[in-house]
Each structure stands twice: as C-alpha cells, then as structure tokens.
Amino acid sequence: MDLLIILTYVAFAWAMFKIFKIPVNKWTIPTAALGGIFIVSGLILLMNYNHPYTFKAQKAVISIPVVPQVTGVVIEVTDKKNTLIKKGEVLFRLDPTRYQARVDRLMADIVTAEHKQRALGAELDEMAANTQQAKATRDKFAKEYQRYARGSQAKVNPFSERDIDVARQNYLAQEASVKSSAAEQKQIQSQLDSLVLGEHSQIASLKAQLAEAKYNLEQTIVRAPSDGYVTQVLIRPGTYAASLPLRPVMVFIPDQKRQIVAQFRQNSLLRLAPGDDAEVVFNALPGKVFSGKLAAISPAVPGGAYQSTGTLQTLNTAPGSDGVIATIELDEHTDLSALPDGIYAQVAVYSDHFSHVSVMRKVLLRMTSWVHYLYLDH
C-alpha cells in the first residue's frame, strides 16, 4: 500500500511539474521528495493508530477435559471421532460390575431394614402386652402384701414374719419386672421414633447411600456434555481410567460460536471499542476476507497477572505477554465452518476516527491475504 501511495504521489508530482512547467533544479526536486515523504508517513501513521492491525490472532475454542467421576476399566469407546456428537451420546463406558454390586447390596440392606422396622413394631406391641401383664401381676402382689401388712398390725397376727417378708419380696420383684419391661418398651419405641424427614434414620441413611451408589453407577457411562466433537481419541477398551482432575482421558470440543482472539499493541487501546467493524484473513484461506465485529476487550493484560508463590514478584517482561486481548465475532460464512479450530489469522479493526484512511488498511489487509498464496517448502 505504501508503494502504491508513493507511485501515486510520484505520478501526481510529475503531472504538476508538466502542467505548471515547474523548473527541475536542486530546490524543486528535494522539495517534492520531502513532500512525498511527509505525506506518505503521515497517512501511514494515521492509519496505524486509528485502524489497529495485528498478526497475533487465532480462531479460539474452549475445550472441556473429560474426566470420569468414578474409577474403572474402559470397556467401550465411541467411534465418532471428529464428527458431530449430540448432547447425551455415549463417549465411553467403564466396567460397572462393582458399582452394580454395591447398588444391589444396598437395596437388599434397605429391604432388611424395613423388615426389621416392622419386626420392631410387632416387638413393641408384644412388649406393651408384657408390660400390662407385669403391671397386673404387680398389682396382685401389692394387694397381697398390703393384706399381710394389715394383718401384722392386728392384736393377734395370723401371719408369720416369713409370710410377710415373702409377700413383700414378691411385690418388689414384680415392680422391678414392670420397670424392666417398661424400659425395654421405651427403648424399642425410641428406635421406631428416630426419624429423618418422616423416615426411619437407618432406612434414610441406606437410601442416601443407595442414591450415591446409583449416581456412581450412572457415571460409569460418560456422555457428551453438549453438542460437539471429540478428537484424538487415545483410550481403548482395557484402559484404566482414574478419577483424577489432572489426568483427563479425552478432550471434548463443544459446538460454540466461532470467535477470533487477537492481541493488539497497547498503543491501540484508545482506538479499540466494542462494536467497531473488523476484518479477518486466515493463512488457510488466501484471497478471502471475513467481516465481523469487535465483541469485547479483556480487562486484564496477560503479562500483568501474578499469583502467590511465597517469593517476591518481579515485572513480567516476557515477549508477547504485554498485548491487549480482544475478541472478534465473525459474521456467518460457509467457509468458516470448514476451518479447524486454533488456526492463525490477521485482524484489522476500523474505528470511527479518520475513517477515510481506513481504505488504506483494507487494501493492505487484502494484499496480506493474497500473499498467503506465496510460500516455499524445502
């Protein structure tokens, strides 16, 4: 573009010399040359500042590391690699034997606990009857003892001391039997009354364990979290998959709006605003330009991010970490769907300032796109 401007200026200057018959000497030639330098430099500087450009851009995509929630041996793996998978389709299965066994055992334990609860109810009824019988016997012995006690207070005692003592001991023994029976009845009642949300505590605990066991059993089938695709499926039946977040067994790429993430110079920040028009060219699609909008600007610069490490931090001066990150959303285009995620691109953003200069940036961007045809492998 700068060469085109220079050639245009040279043609314009030559025409001016011819039309106005300006003499060619040591003053007019340097003046025309300096004028061209100032004009071309001014236009390029205006274009660079008001219509930012960067070659550090990429078709970004968010991936989901697939980590099983349970541990086990892989018995089945999907054969849909790099093809669209619907949400809920099976990615792979783990051996469910031990998880199914735990579910079956807990279901049996719940049946046993429910039977035990019913047995406790019957035992409570039996114990209540025993308590009533013990009370009746106690009342009988109490009356007999009172009769012996009243006889002992008469002038002529018809009972011996041994008979009175035996009646007293029978009454006290039966009173203890009543208390023991009542205590056992109360203990059984307390077991029946230990409720959690209206359900017996032991049964509620077993049902909670059963719900967890069923969840773990369901997790032996790993499904697609959304529409998308998997690539580089490296697991095979027989692989031991562990529930470790730092060791995913598969990477899932969800179906999402395709965005371009670009890194601009900090000098361009004042000319980057959400909603500005943008154009993108890809190395993989020479000669084609795609339009879009500047969607967002990251509120943080990567080079300024720090984490606590227990040591004093220094300034991060690593190359490439000082740029402003911006997101560009592209308009719908059939060619974009065929592009693999992660490919590189070049981006130009057109601000409202000095909009007439943006034509220079557009021409340069298209020239860059055509240059992508030229490469040499050797």
From Swiss-Prot:
One of its GO terms (biological process) is transmembrane transport. Residues 17-26, 78-378 are periplasmic. Keywords: Cell inner membrane, Cell membrane, Membrane, Signal, Transmembrane, Transmembrane helix. InterPro entries: CusB-like_dom_1, CusB_D23, MFP. It is found in: Cell inner membrane. It comes from the Bacteria. Residues 1-15 form the signal peptide. Pfam families: CusB_dom_1, HlyD_D23. GO terms for cellular component: plasma membrane. Residues 48-56 are cytoplasmic. The chain crosses the membrane at residues 27-47, 57-77. It is a multi-pass membrane protein. Belongs to the membrane fusion protein (MFP) (TC 8.A.1) family. This is Inner membrane protein YiaV. It comes from Escherichia coli (strain K12). The lineage of its organism: Bacteria, Pseudomonadati, Pseudomonadota, Gammaproteobacteria, Enterobacterales. The gene is yiaV.
